[in-house]
UniProtKB/Swiss-Prot annotation:
SUPFAM superfamilies: 2Fe-2S ferredoxin-like. Belongs to the adrenodoxin/putidaredoxin family. [2Fe-2S] cluster binds at residues 42, 48, 51, 88. One of its GO terms (molecular function) is 2 iron, 2 sulfur cluster binding. This is 2Fe-2S ferredoxin. It comes from Rickettsia bellii (strain RML369-C). Ferredoxin are iron-sulfur proteins that transfer electrons in a wide variety of metabolic reactions.
């Protein structure tokens, strides 16, 4: 059995969904495989910002800095914050155990 970590998705209405997610998947993949409404229109190819999520600063700081392509797409995201990332670019590792991922109230798909 592959190792899992705890991921909490905070949905727009404040509801929290706690999921045991396998290491190596992206936040976008975990959302899709657990019926969480995180769009991902470009399927993780860094061509949109519909998988925009907001992280707690503690976990944001555990990630590598976003690449320029991700930053360019984040500039298009609705409700951008200092701890915004694209869900397709966050790959689960052990150091992210307990991560809380907040979904923004809306998305903007500019392709």
């Amino acid at each position: 059995m592959s190792k899992t970590i705890k991921v909490t998705f905070v949905i727009n209405n404040g509801e929290e969904k706690i999921i045991e997610a396998p290491l190596g998947l992206s936040i976008l993949e975990v959302a899709h495989s657990n019926s969480i409404d995180l769009e991902g229109a470009c399927e993780g190819s860094l061509a949109c910002a519909t998988c925009h999520v907001i992280l707690e600063e503690e976990f944001y700081n555990k990630l590598e800095k976003p690449k320029e392509e991700e930053e360019d797409m984040l500039d298009l995201a609705f409700g951008l914050t200092d701890t915004s990332r694209l869900g397709c670019q966050i790959i689960l590792t052990e150091k992210l155990d307990g991560i809380k991922v907040r979904l923004p109230s809306a998305t903007r798909n500019i392709k």
